[in-house]
Amino acid sequence: MKYTSSFLALLLCVLLGFSGSYGQGPFFKEIENLKEYFNASNPDVAKGGPLFSEILKNWKEESDKKIIQSQIVSFYFKLFENLKDNQVIQRSMDIIKQDMFQKFLNGSSEKLEDFKRLIQIPVDDLQIQRKAINELIKVMNDLSPKSNLRKRKRSQNLFRGRRASM
């Protein structure tokens, strides 16, 4: 577990580096603290390749990237929750979580609470499974690209209106 946590702390650096602000935020020093604590600079951490950076390379579109980033951020929140009793690194984790919260959820505490609720839902609970299946049609409908269709129709109507007035 220690090697996994070390590698994950290192990957947090990589993930936050993709946002274009690596080395600029208050989190940089705290990530360095975590890397030191977990001995994440040790060469054996690289065994088996990276966890997230190769996956992120496959997601080019901004909206698609947000999907995979949400899973990665969820992973880090779970990791930090698992390590919450470790007083040596608690401050560093709190600062990183706050910065991640600002970047990923735009500082919205409501979104953070929703995000936390989602990652806490147990998938092995029968009642939860039943509720999830019951809501599946609504979720699938929400996933469909209706909003793009509406935008396209609006754009077409706007274009037609301009052409008619010329």
From Swiss-Prot:
Residues 1-23 form the signal peptide. GO terms for molecular function: cytokine activity; type II interferon receptor binding. Glycans are attached at N39, N106. Transmembrane segments: none annotated. The modification Pyrrolidone carboxylic acid is found at Q24. One of its GO terms (biological process) is positive regulation of CD4-positive, CD25-positive, alpha-beta regulatory T cell differentiation involved in immune response. It is found in: Secreted. Pfam families: IFN-gamma. One of its GO terms (cellular component) is extracellular space. Keywords: Antiviral defense, Cytokine, Glycoprotein, Growth regulation, Pyrrolidone carboxylic acid, Secreted, Signal. InterPro entries: 4_helix_cytokine-like_core, Interferon_gamma. Released primarily from activated T lymphocytes. Belongs to the type II (or gamma) interferon family. Type II interferon produced by immune cells such as T-cells and NK cells that plays crucial roles in antimicrobial, antiviral, and antitumor responses by activating effector immune cells and enhancing antigen presentation. Primarily signals through the JAK-STAT pathway after interaction with its receptor IFNGR1 to affect gene regulation. Upon IFNG binding, IFNGR1 intracellular domain opens out to allow association of downstream signaling components JAK2, JAK1 and STAT1, leading to STAT1 activation, nuclear translocation and transcription of IFNG-regulated genes. Homodimer. Interacts with IFNGR1 (via extracellular domain); this interaction promotes IFNGR1 dimerization. This is Interferon gamma. It comes from Ovis aries. The gene is IFNG.
